[in-house]
Amino acid sequence: MARITVDDCLKRIPNRFDLTLAAAYRARQIANGAQLLIDSNAGSKDKPTVVALREIAAGQIGREVLERAIRS
C-alpha cells in the first residue's frame, strides 16, 4: 500500500487548516460507521484517519465535507 503524504492531499485541499478539519471530520464519520468511498479492502486494515486521507488524496472528499458540517 502506498504511503499517503500531506502533499498528496494538499493538491486537493490547498489550505492545511481546512485539510486538517476535513480529514478529522471524515475520519470521525468513518469511525462511526460511514460507508468508505475508496476500495474497502484498503480500509479494512487502516485506521479511520488514514482512510480519510486516502479518500482526500483520491479526490473523493473535498471542501464540501466542511461546508456540510458547518450547515448541520
Swiss-Prot record:
CC per GO annotation: DNA-directed RNA polymerase complex
Alphabetized UniProt keyword annotations: DNA-directed RNA polymerase, Nucleotidyltransferase, Transcription, Transferase
Database matches in InterPro entries: DNA-dir_RNA_pol_omega, Pol_omega/Rpo6/RPB6, RPB6/omega-like_sf
Catalytic reaction equation(s): RNA(n) + a ribonucleoside 5'-triphosphate = RNA(n+1) + diphosphate
NCBIfam families from the UniProt entry: rpoZ (TIGR00690)
HAMAP family reported in the protein's UniProt record: RNApol_bact_RpoZ
General function of this protein: Promotes RNA polymerase assembly. Latches the N- and C-terminal regions of the beta' subunit thereby facilitating its interaction with the beta and alpha subunits.
Protein name (Swiss-Prot/TrEMBL): DNA-directed RNA polymerase subunit omega
Species: Laribacter hongkongensis (strain HLHK9)
Source species taxonomy: Bacteria, Pseudomonadati, Pseudomonadota, Betaproteobacteria, Neisseriales
